[in-house]
Amino acid sequence: MHRRLVAGCRISTCLLIGLLALAATGAAATEPTEQLKASIDRVLAVLEDPKLKPAPTAPERSAAVRKIADDIFDFDEIAQRSLARHWRMLTDEQRQEFVHLFSDLLERSYMSKIELYSGEPIQYTGERVDGDLATVTTRIITKNGTEVPIDYRMLKHGAGWLVFDVIIEGVSLVANYRAQFNTIIQTASYGELIKKIQARLEELRTPR
């Protein structure tokens, strides 16, 4: 049951590759695609830093990558959209708890796999901007030559853009979690959902 809190293998594998294109630059205002293109070097610099390659530095390396994720992902928006109508029934304290747990789940589920990236090319194929909303379309070329389309849905925040959904081969990360969370809440309770997320986090924190 705990595994149902994590997206499928195809989603997780492609997402961790796509995350390399999502390191915020913290620079002046840029168009969404320009921000994605310019930001890849920040993550690659962490992965290629010789000081962070030895096994004992793995926690430091992971923390550096997670910090970059915090800069580009709108975890509040992702959490709210993933809970959908159930979000409205939560107190402010419950919302804060959920955002904290869910963002930790996302980061640990995907960031821990980031080092599996081995140079797969990322092609930027288009951009649609509608006010404060944008979609950047890309595709990943896998080692066997398969093209995997990945779309990034983004919200404008100040001078930059934050990602609130990733759509891989037509499957939305947010919609995937929304369906899982809704099933658990409907068949059990919101409290049970929190317990399952906490249990999954314990699994991810346990060294293997």
What are these regions (language model features)?
Residues 147-175:
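Short beta-strand edge/turn micro-motifs at domain boundaries
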Residues 31-110:
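Early exported N-terminus immediately downstream of N-terminal targeting peptides
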Residues 1-8:
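N-terminal secretory signal peptides that target proteins for export/translocation
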Residues 168-208:
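Low-complexity, intrinsically disordered terminal/linker segments enriched in charged
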Residues 23-30:
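Bacterial Sec-dependent signal peptides at the C-terminal "C-region" and cleavage site
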Residues 108-148, 197-208:
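Surface-exposed, charged secondary-structure patches
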Residues 37, 44-46, 99, 123, ...:
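Soluble periplasmic/extracytoplasmic beta-strand elements of cell-envelope proteins
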Residues 10-23:
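Bacterial N-terminal signal peptides
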